[in-house]
From Swiss-Prot:
Lipidation feature positions (S-diacylglycerol cysteine): 19
Subcellular location: Cell outer membrane
Identification of the protein by name: Adhesin MafA 1/4
Residue ranges of coiled coil: none
Signal peptide segment: 1-18
Lineage: Bacteria, Pseudomonadati, Pseudomonadota, Betaproteobacteria, Neisseriales
GO biological process assignments: cell adhesion
Region (Disordered) residue spans: 287-320
Length: 320
C-alpha cells in the first residue's frame, strides 16, 4: 500500500522539480539593467511626459528647467522560495525480522588411570566457545520512505543607495524635449525664451515585490515616474500653467504555483497615485482668502494617506 502511494509522489517530484523559469529582477540601477527593467522605466517616463497638458504654451518659446530626484541604487532578495527537493527527505523505516543460527564444535576426551590393580576410565564431552558456523536469515521485506515540505519564508532583502545616474536624467530630459517638439512648442536657450517651464521629477525608480501564499506565488517589478510641472510668463510673471502632477506606473509580473512556472507573465501600465505633497494649492502671499496660509495639513490631494498626530503637532510647533 505504501509503495503504491510513494510511486506517484516520487514521480511527480521528479517531473515537477525541473519545471521552472528564473528571470532575474534586480532593483533600479546597481549594474547593467536587463531588458524588462529598461522597458518598465522607459514606459513609465514616457507615459508621464506624454500626459503633460501643454496647450497653454502653443506658439511660445520656452526654456526648460528639469530637476530629478536621485534614482540609482542596487538591491537583492535572497531565499524565500519553496525547496522542492525537500519533498524526499525525512524517513520512515520498516525493518525485517532477522534470525541468526550458530554451530559450535564439540570434542570428546577420554582418560584412563591405573592404581594398585585398579583401572579407571573417564570420558568427557566439551564444546568450544567459538562458533564454527554462523548463518543469518531475514524474514519479511524492508522499506524506507519520506514526505515533507520546506518553506523558505519571505527571504532577506539588502539594498544599497548610490549617486544619481546622469544617463537617466539625460534620457528623461530628451523625452521632455521630444514631446515639446511634437506638440509644436519651441525649446530654446534661456536667453531667447519668453516662458520658463519647471519640471520636478520626484519619483523615478522601481519597486520589487515577492508574494508567497503557499500554492500561489508571484514576482512583481514596478517602475514609477511622478513629476510636477508649471510654466511662468517671463514678461508679467504670471502662471501660464499652474502646478500639475503626472504619475504613472508600469508593472511586470510572473505568476507561479508552488514556485513552478511561471504559468503566466503579464505587463501593463496605468496611472498611479500622485505625490504625497504637491504645490497646486500654493498662492502668493496676500492672494489667499483664509485666515492662515495654506499648509501641509490641508493637503488632501493624496487620498489614502494621512498625517499622524505627532507629525501635525510638530508642524504646528515649528519643529522639523
Amino acid at each position: 500500500m505504501r509503495a503504491r502511494l510513494l510511486i506517484p509522489i516520487l514521480f511527480s517530484v521528479f517531473i515537477l522539480s525541473a519545471c521552472g523559469t528564473l528571470t532575474g529582477i534586480p532593483s533600479h540601477g546597481g549594474g547593467k539593467r536587463f531588458a524588462v527593467e529598461q522597458e518598465l522605466v522607459a514606459a513609465s517616463a514616457r507615459a508621464a511626459v506624454k500626459d503633460m497638458d501643454l496647450q497653454a504654451l502653443h506658439g511660445r518659446k520656452v526654456a526648460l528647467y528639469i530637476a530629478t530626484m536621485g534614482d540609482q541604487g542596487s538591491g537583492s532578495l535572497t531565499g524565500g522560495r519553496y525547496s522542492i527537493d525537500a519533498l524526499i527527505r525525512g524517513e520512515y523505516i520498516n525493518s525485517p525480522a532477522v534470525r541468526t543460527d550458530y554451530t559450535y564444535p564439540r570434542y570428546e576426551t577420554t582418560a584412563e588411570t591405573t592404581s594398585g590393580g585398579l583401572t579407571g576410565l573417564t570420558t568427557s564431552l566439551s564444546t568450544l566457545n567459538a562458533p564454527a558456523l554462523s548463518r543469518t536469515q531475514s524474514d519479511g521485506s524492508g522499506s524506507r520512505s519520506s514526505l515533507g515540505l520546506n518553506i523558505g519564508g519571505m527571504g532577506d532583502y539588502r539594498n544599497e543607495t548610490l549617486t544619481t545616474n546622469p544617463r537617466d536624467t539625460a534620457f528623461l530630459s530628451h523625452l521632455v524635449q521630444t514631446v515639446f517638439f511634437l506638440r509644436g512648442i519651441d525649446v530654446v536657450s534661456p536667453a531667447n525664451a519668453d516662458t520658463d517651464v519647471f519640471i520636478n521629477i520626484d519619483v523615478f525608480g522601481t519597486i520589487r515585490n515577492r508574494t508567497e501564499m503557499h500554492l500561489y506565488n508571484a514576482e512583481t517589478l514596478k517602475a514609477q515616474t511622478k513629476l510636477e510641472y508649471f510654466a511662468v510668463d517671463r514678461t508679467n510673471k504670471k502662471l501660464l500653467i499652474k502646478p500639475k502632477t503626472n504619475a504613472f506606473e508600469a508593472a511586470y509580473k510572473e505568476n507561479y504555483a508552488l514556485w513552478m512556472g511561471p504559468y503566466k507573465v503579464s505587463k501593463g501600465i496605468k496611472p498611479t497615485e500622485g505625490l504625497m505633497v504637491d504645490f497646486s494649492d500654493i498662492q502668493p502671499y496676500g492672494n489667499h482668502t483664509g485666515n492662515s496660509a495654506p499648509s501641509v495639513e490641508a493637503d488632501n490631494s493624496h487620498e489614502g494617506y494621512g498625517y499622524s498626530d505627532e507629525a501635525v503637532r510638530q508642524h504646528r510647533q515649528g519643529q522639523p
